[in-house]
């Protein structure tokens, strides 16, 4: 990135410096998906012939002593323009290791028509028994079955494949890995080629696994993993823990290349007797840093570190998820007694993750443990302090493995959905967003009082926990934002109207209100289009900061806030060495754990 400096003339009619204040509620919502496509690195080859599987039926309670230790079942919903090539390469990574007498690796992959054209450009849905090879340019494993074009966003597709995999490749332990886009409690694993867009909701994944249990007699998967974005949420874990011993997922978005399959599968085939705890440890310890796409000189150590800096991945022991929900319930009961504007403040300052609903609303996916930690800094109430400690202890006990990059400090392994008032309306009142949060997260909410708390927090409804029920708010009740306030920004004063080179001007103003963050923005007036273009948006760095669980937040002091800072005429551009292009960097993190202010394109 190049910093471009040039002489600036700053009369008020040509450029305007604006002070912007972030509070608790904003509007405008759009559902986003995340993923990065690979570069077109590999040449196409022809598909190979179908191989017929040997069917071995297993009945519940039958002797499994002669069976392989593991069958790894990968549901690769790659019928997606963005992620197809990445997910195709993941299967090539699996072939670096391949199946062994003790570890079966079985993949169903549905490709997209019109995106990645490599490896014969096939677009149907194929099932592979992964065999070892060193060819990263094509999938050479035998096609055990071709099932034509199927809709991977339909529950029956998941049911059919996993049932088939268990019946044809029985083992002592099973791992189900679901790979594609993810969206936490909203679900994921879509099919972009379907006649109408489809994806699997969390209730549909749950019901699919229940049918798979009936079909196969497998009571629990040793591990359920989501190689997908944003699935590391209590809403997801709280819905699926009865069906597994361990679960692996990420609180934050994942890079497009996903998990480091070759690395953790190699550890598994070297020690196949490990349980889900051991397998989880391998998946997480190898994440990013051992990915075939990055290793072997394909990326520098600095580039790998940069990739890892914004990632998260965690594993939870399923049997301990109810303890987390129980501790969360006690904590929520305690914080109903405190000023709800302080709860809103804690939500704003908690470690947050990618905003699935767009940049115009506050991020709603935040870390559960960090939220409890932040709240303890805002009150001295003994019950809140004690229940926060209990919740953090329950999370620590349930999370058996976790890693996060330096820019993701405050991540403890389990996130949850805490919307601001606008998003609460959108996901609970707006008929254009079916299904509602209460319906999508029903399995979790039936055990939790989080739904009752949200209704209390935003509508003032009495906090009345109802066991075994997912509570939807009274949709006639008025929603009130507890942290919202009147906001006033005084006149912006600039010490000079002409600067150049490394010179600066002093900008001063006064801000009144319940302020979370202060941004400064530079606008240029374009007389031809009669509109402004944005030159720069920056954080106003407070003189004092508070650090909570590694997360830095500003301490502006009491309102009114006196703003004074030195502004320099800096614009940014991207260059490839030959061409430069101006870019707008938007604020992403106030200050990371290493003291750096983070911006993103």
Question: Language model features by range: what are they?
Answer:
Residues 21-25, 38-63:
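Ser/Thr-rich, Proline-interspersed low-complexity disordered segments
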Residues 148-218:
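Extracytoplasmic mature domains of secreted/periplasmic and thylakoid-lumen proteins
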Residues 79-82, 180-186, 225, 229-233:
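Gly/Ser/Thr-rich loops at beta-strand to alpha-helix junctions
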Residues 55-170:
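N-terminal extension/subdomain marker
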């Amino acid at each position: 990135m190049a910093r471009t400096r040039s002489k600036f003339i700053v009369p008020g009619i040509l450029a305007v410096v604006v002070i912007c204040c972030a509070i608790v509620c904003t509007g405008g919502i759009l559902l986003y998906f995340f993923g990065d496509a690979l570069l077109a690195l590999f040449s196409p080859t022809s598909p190979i012939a179908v191989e017929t599987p040997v069917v071995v039926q297993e009945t519940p309670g039958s002797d499994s002593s002669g069976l392989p230790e593991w069958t790894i079942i990968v549901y690769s919903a790659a019928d997606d323009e963005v992620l197809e090539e990445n997910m195709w390469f993941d299967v090539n990574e699996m072939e670096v290791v391949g199946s062994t007498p003790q570890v079966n690796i079985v993949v169903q992959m549905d490709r997209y028509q019109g995106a990645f054209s490599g490896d014969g450009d096939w677009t149907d849905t194929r099932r592979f028994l992964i065999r070892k090879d060193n060819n990263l340019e094509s999938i050479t494993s035998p096609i055990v079955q071709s099932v034509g074009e199927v809709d991977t966003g339909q529950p029956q597709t998941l049911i059919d494949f996993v049932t088939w995999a268990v019946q044809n490749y029985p083992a002592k332990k099973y791992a189900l890995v679901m790979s594609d886009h993810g969206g936490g409690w909203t679900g994921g694993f879509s099919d972009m080629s379907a006649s109408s867009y489809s994806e699997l909701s969390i209730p549909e994944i749950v019901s699919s696994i229940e049918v798979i249990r009936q079909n196969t007699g497998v009571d629990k998967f040793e591990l359920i993993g989501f190689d997908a974005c944003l699935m590391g949420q209590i809403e997801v874990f709280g819905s699926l823990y009865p069906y597994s011993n361990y679960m692996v997922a990420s609180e934050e978005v994942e890079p497009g290349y996903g998990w480091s399959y070759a690395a953790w599968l190699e550890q598994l085939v070297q020690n196949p007797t490990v349980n889900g705890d051991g397998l989880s440890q391998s998946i997480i310890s190898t994440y990013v840093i051992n990915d075939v796409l990055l290793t072997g000189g394909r990326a520098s150590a600095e580039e790998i570190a940069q990739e890892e800096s914004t990632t998260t991945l965690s594993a939870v022991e399923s049997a301990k998820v109810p303890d987390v929900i129980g501790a969360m319930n006690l904590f929520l009961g305690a914080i109903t007694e405190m000023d709800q504007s302080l709860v809103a403040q804690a939500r704003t300052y908690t470690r947050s993750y990618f905003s699935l609903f767009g940049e115009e609303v506050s991020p709603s996916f935040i870390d559960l443990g960090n939220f409890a930690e932040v709240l303890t800094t805002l009150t001295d109430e003994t019950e809140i302090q004690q229940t926060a400690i209990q919740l953090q202890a329950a999370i620590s006990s349930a999370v058996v493995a976790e890693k996060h990059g330096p820019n993701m400090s405050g991540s403890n392994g389990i996130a949850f959905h805490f919307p601001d008032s606008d998003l609460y309306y959108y996901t609970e009142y707006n008929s254009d967003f079916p299904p509602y949060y209460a319906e999508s997260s029903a399995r979790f909410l039936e055990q939790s009082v989080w739904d009752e708390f949200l209704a209390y927090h935003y509508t003032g409804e009495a906090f009345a926990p109802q066991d075994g029920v997912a509570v939807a708010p009274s949709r006639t009740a008025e929603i009130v934002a507890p942290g919202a306030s009147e906001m006033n920004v005084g006149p912006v004063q600039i010490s000079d109207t002409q600067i150049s080179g490394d010179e600066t001007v002093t900008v001063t103003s006064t801000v009144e209100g319940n302020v979370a963050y202060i941004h400064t923005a530079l606008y240029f007036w374009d007389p031809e289009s009669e509109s402004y273009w944005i030159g720069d948006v920056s954080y106003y760095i407070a003189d004092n900061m508070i650090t909570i669980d590694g997360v830095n937040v500003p301490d502006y002091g009491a309102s009114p806030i006196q703003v004074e800072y030195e502004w320099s005429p800096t614009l940014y551009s991207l260059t490839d060495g030959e061409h430069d292009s101006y870019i707008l960097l938007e604020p992403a993190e106030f200050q990371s754990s290493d003291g750096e202010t983070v911006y993103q394109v």
